[in-house]
A protein has these predicted regions:
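C-terminal charged capping/lid subdomain of soluble metabolic enzymes
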Residues: 375-378, 468-544
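A glycine- and Lys/Arg-enriched "phosphate-lid" helix/loop adjacent to the NTP-binding pocket
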Residues: 95-140
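NTP-dependent small-molecule kinase module
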Residues: 2, 22, 26, 136-187
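Walker A/P-loop
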Residues: 17
Length: 544
């Protein structure tokens, strides 16, 4: 099914071409610049058209091409700001998709195009005055376009993200973060005219307050046909959020069947999965009918594992309700259940059709669970966003939605490059080899985020001891985590923790793999580390 176009217009120098190319690249769509089409059709450059044929001839060519672009073909299109002065051109372009007007201050525009001689409309002694004159002349036409984005102070990446969010119909504080990957053989195909991504090439993480109430139409927009669907949740989340989801799904034509399971990591087992299979069979859930995970990391992992294996795979949707699940477990497609021998030992890669993150759901999250989620955000900063780490270390959480988006962005970049953990995706396991051992020893009374915090400190201590990083770095990381209310030491037996690491799934053969830190924002993979060094790192986080 053909996707609507994303059309960027606005005055010269506002970023139509550069932002358009970035958006097209992120979404895997063709990029078209209307000016390039004009040059190809005229057989001469734009300055030559103006000089030899005059502006009316240029505008006539422009109008003809706008009419041709009226059909939705799934392109990202950059259109000169002069084209949309004509209401007929605006109408034709908007018929093909979402028309967005990019804005910038006259001074910013001059700084971007002031030395470009390929701008016949700016042929004047005082270019700033000419820019202001043209902006005033076109103001009414630009104001007639409902969707605007000011790019004056935005980086290219930030502007592209905002364009994608606007094209997806998200609010001003919303984010649309696409994750593109090569679909493996047998992946359930999907296609939707409302989704921004081409079918079967990836999925999107949508982040915006109030998103749960829009879940039904967002799931349909991701290419899932309305009909019956399974909602897997637990008793706590069901009490707070299930009714809002039910209404949203019903409004979009879905028929939700809710399957409640007990709360807690202790229930992320093959027995619980088998119970869901039996209940799905009794409900006669068919292939193509999606499984929707409404809950934290346990629900997402378990529901995703069941979705990957029920009828050899059905569509899967993640709606995380804990901070930890929002910034980590819901993104990337890793799903699993635990065995008595260790965490996540039986699992699969199951990419979701869409991930819907509603920060408003965190209002019902207990404080300790919120703090546990902050550990994964600190981890994301250490792996790939020094600014995020420094902000958390110095100021603590700022804008919740933006902070979640920052952490998801780090993970999305890694997952796109390595969707099936053949290489650098292992970076995301920073602190987890230590942390999973601590969880296992605690009988899963230690929260995952708390274990990750302790494991990250241990990884930093190991990194410093082996000469990978500045000796002061473990102290900085310990202080940042402690400031956020996370544990920096724990009562356990270091020898038992070392033995428990032998069952960790991240080992290669008999060798344990550790993610070590070079500096904030850069990590590396190391193997064949002596047991004595690992034990010494564990002792650094052991409460005496």
């Amino acid at each position: 099914m053909t996707h609507p176009n994303i059309i960027l217009t606005g005055f010269m120098g506002t970023g139509k071409t550069s932002v358009g190319r970035e958006v097209a690249g992120r979404l895997g769509r063709p990029f078209v610049d209307l000016d390039d089409l004009i040059v190809a059709r005229a057989g001469k450059s734009i300055p030559a058209i103006f000089a030899q044929d005059g502006e009316p001839a240029f505008r006539a060519l422009e109008a003809a091409l706008c009419r041709e672009m009226a059909e939705p073909t799934g392109i990202v299109l950059a259109v000169g700001g002069g084209a949309v002065v004509d209401p007929a051109n605006r109408q034709a372009l908007a018929a093909g998709g979402t028309l967005i007007c990019l804005d910038a201050t006259p001074e910013a525009i001059l700084s971007r195009v002031g030395h470009d001689d390929n701008r016949p409309m700016l042929a004047a002694p005082d270019r700033l005055a000419r820019i202001r004159e043209l902006l005033d002349r076109r103001a009414a036409a630009y104001d007639a376009i409902p969707i605007h984005l000011d790019t004056t102070h935005l980086s290219l990446a930030a502007a592209a993200e905002r364009v994608m969010a606007l094209a997806a119909g998200l609010p001003e504080d919303g984010y649309y973060l696409p994750i593109r990957y090569e679909a493996p053989a047998g992946e359930v195909g999907r296609s939707s005219s409302a989704d921004l991504l081409p079918a079967s090439s990836g999925y999107a993480v949508l982040i915006a307050p109030g998103l749960l109430a829009e879940a039904g139409r967002r799931i349909a927009a991701a290419g899932i046909r309305p009909g019956r669907c399974a909602v897997v949740t637990n008793e706590v989340v069901e009490r707070h959020h299930a009714e809002t989801l039910r209404r949203s799904l019903a409004d979009a034509g879905f028929e939700p069947v809710v399957f409640e399971i007990p709360d807690g990591e202790a229930y992320k087992t093959l027995d619980t999965a088998a119970g869901l299979y039996a209940r799905f069979a009794a409900a006669r859930l068919a292939r193509g009918e999606p499984v929707i995970a409404l809950g934290g990391g346990v629900i997402g992992d378990l529901a995703g594992f069941v979705a990957a294996t029920w009828l050899r795979g059905v569509p899967f949707v993640q709606i995380p309700t804990s901070l930890l699940a929002m910034v980590d477990a819901s993104v990337g497609g890793k799903v699993a259940v635990d065995l008595p021998a260790g965490k996540n030992l039986v699992g699969a890669f199951k990419q979701p059709a869409v991930v819907l993150i509603d920060p408003d759901l965190l209002r019902t999250l207990p404080g300790a669970e919120f703090r546990a989620g902050l550990a994964e955000i600190v981890k994301a900063g250490i792996i790939g966003d020094a600014r995020l780490f420094e902000q958390l270390a110095a100021e603590g959480p700022a804008s919740l939605t933006a902070m979640i988006a920052d952490a998801v962005r780090v993970k999305a970049r890694v997952v796109e490059r390595d969707p099936f953990e053949l290489g650098e995706r292992a970076w995301l396991n920073l602190g987890h080899t230590f942390g999973h051992a601590l969880e296992l020893l605690s009988g899963y009374t230690l929260r995952h985020g708390e274990a990750v915090a302790l494991g990250t400190i241990a990884a930093a201590e190991l990194s410093a001891a082996l000469g990978y990083c500045d000796p002061a770095l473990p102290g900085r990381i310990r202080a940042a985590l402690g400031r956020l209310g996370l544990p920096t030491s724990h009562t356990f037996d270091p020898q038992a923790a070392l033995a428990a690491m032998g069952t960790d799934k991240k080992r290669r053969g008999r060798a344990l793999r550790f993610i070590l830190i070079r500096r904030i924002g850069e990590v590396t993979i190391a193997e064949d580390i002596e047991a004595g060094a690992i034990l010494a790192a564990l002792e650094k986080i052991c409460k005496t």
